[in-house]
Amino acid sequence: VEWTDAERSAILSLWGKIDTDELGPALLARLXLVXXXTQRYF
């Protein structure tokens, strides 16, 4: 994928706003709950 400078800037800006310490465990828990039902699609 070739990202433009504007796209890179937007992505970095969004990632800067995410609190990974707070959201990380919640996202992993959701992944563990959904993975069994969607495993065959990946």
From Swiss-Prot:
Entry GO MF terms: heme binding; metal ion binding; oxygen binding; oxygen carrier activity
Domain Globin: 2-42
Tissues in which the UniProt entry reports expression: Red blood cells.
Coiled-coil annotated residue ranges, if any: none
UniProt keyword annotation of Transcription regulation present: no
UniProt xrefs under InterPro entries: Globin, Globin-like_sf, Globin/Proto
This protein's UniProt keywords: Heme, Iron, Metal-binding, Oxygen transport, Transport
Miscellaneous comment text of the record: This fish has ten hemoglobins, 8 of which are anodal and 2 cathodal. The cathodal tetramers do not exhibit the Bohr effect, due to lack of the C-terminal His in the beta chains and to blocking of the alpha-amino group on the N-terminal residue of the alpha chains. The possession of both anodal and cathodal hemoglobins may be a physiological advantage for fish living in fast-moving water habitats. This fish possesses 6 types of hemoglobin chains, including a major alpha chain, a minor alpha chain, two major beta chains, and two minor beta chains.
Quaternary structure, from the entry: Heterotetramer of two alpha chains and two beta chains.
Family, per entry: Belongs to the globin family.
Function: Involved in oxygen transport from gills to the various peripheral tissues.
Name of the protein this chain belongs to: Hemoglobin subunit beta-A
Organism: Catostomus clarkii
